[in-house]
């Protein structure tokens, strides 16, 4: 995997396609570029797609976290992503963010608003941040220490790949019959990838999202985010409250929301063909026709 020098660290990335339309893809917390392995090959070669890996994730450098995790703050990740674009000679591009990648995109929009064009968000952490839930650090500590716990935790990020009755406390998640061999292999690899994450990811991310929630500093600058936004949300999402997303879309000046009743947090691995179609239509200036309909999803699953 290629790496680019960004400040004092190296950031890893993968590229697909070529052309004047460039999309920077930013994964979510506990993630890596592999989260898009099923979707990226379905994208047209006329889109240049750059899938970046956060510091502390994947093949990127993993600096020792500061005591307050400030070097793993959302603003720091945003600066890394902008630095990667500089290193690759990309003056202007579109943005895509999944989950916590969404709030990283928002930081980039307020820092360099003229640099970015359209924004596609998938089940995003919003500019409001996220409250630190009771017991959350304990759960993350267990996931870090125990691969089985990590498997169970990540399964809730792609719930349609698993039998619903096994996604409960005390049960080991079991793949559903509809989960393809490729999806099963990828999910297993994504769990393996969590074994190398920095503590700045495991623990710095939730602490910084809680700081964002308490300060509302980024949310107070949403008036700067005038870029066209399309926000996708799977209604089976265990991780991001729908009311957060609805509130964000209401306050942004140029945003629309599409709901998908039969998808969870990660359309990119749950229904990659549907995700690739929406991604392609949006960034090639076509209005998405998916509309979250059951019929459309049924065909594409």
Q: What residue ranges belong to the model's regions?
A:
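Catalytic active-site module of serine/aspartate enzymes centered on a nucleophile-bearing elbow/loop
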Residues: 254-301
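Flexible "cap/lid" loop of the alpha/beta hydrolase fold
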Residues: 110, 117-158
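Active-site loop/oxyanion-hole signature of alpha/beta-hydrolase fold enzymes
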Residues: 51-100, 277
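Conserved HGGG/HGGXW glycine-rich cap/lid loop of the alpha/beta-hydrolase fold
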Residues: 9-65
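Conserved alpha/beta-hydrolase catalytic His-Asp/Glu region
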Residues: 129-134, 151-223
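Acidic catalytic loop of the alpha/beta-hydrolase fold
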Residues: 236-240
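Conserved alpha/beta-hydrolase "nucleophile elbow" surrounding the catalytic nucleophile
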Residues: 27-29, 93, 97-102, 234
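Short beta-strand/loop motif that positions the catalytic acidic residue
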Residues: 225, 231-233
């Amino acid at each position: 995997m290629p790496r680019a020098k960004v400040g004092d660290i190296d950031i890893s990335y993968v590229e697909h396609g070529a052309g004047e339309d460039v999309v920077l893809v930013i994964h979510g917390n506990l993630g890596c570029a592999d989260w898009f392995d099923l979707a990226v090959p379905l994208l047209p070669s006329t889109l240049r797609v750059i899938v970046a890996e956060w510091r502390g994730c994947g093949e990127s450098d993993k600096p020792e976290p500061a005591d307050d995790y400030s070097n793993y703050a959302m603003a720091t990740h945003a600066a890394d992503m902008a630095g990667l674009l500089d290193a690759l000679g990309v003056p202007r591009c579109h943005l895509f963010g999944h989950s916590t990648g969404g709030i990283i995109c928002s930081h980039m929009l307020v820092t360099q608003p003229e640099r970015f064009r359209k924004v596609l968000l998938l089940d995003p952490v919003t500019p409001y941040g996220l409250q630190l839930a009771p017991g959350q650090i304990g759960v993350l500590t267990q996931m870090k220490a125990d691969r089985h716990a990590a498997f169970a935790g990540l399964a809730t990020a792609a719930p349609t790949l698993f039998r619903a009755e096994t996604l409960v406390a005390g049960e080991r998640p079991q793949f559903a019959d509809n989960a393809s061999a490729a999806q099963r292999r990828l999910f297993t690899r994504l769990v393996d990838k969590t074994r190398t994450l920095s503590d700045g990811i495991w623990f710095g991310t939730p602490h910084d999202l809680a700081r964002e929630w308490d300060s509302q500093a980024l949310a107070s600058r949403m008036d700067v985010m005038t870029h066209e936004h399309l926000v996708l949300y799977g209604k089976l999402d265990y991780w991001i409250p729908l009311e957060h997303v609805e509130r964000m879309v209401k306050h942004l000046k140029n945003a629309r929301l599409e709901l998908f009743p039969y998808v969870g947090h990660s359309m990119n691995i749950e229904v990659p063909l549907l995700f690739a179609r929406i991604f392609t239509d949006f960034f090639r200036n076509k209005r998405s026709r998916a509309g979250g309909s059951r019929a459309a999803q049924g065909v594409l699953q």
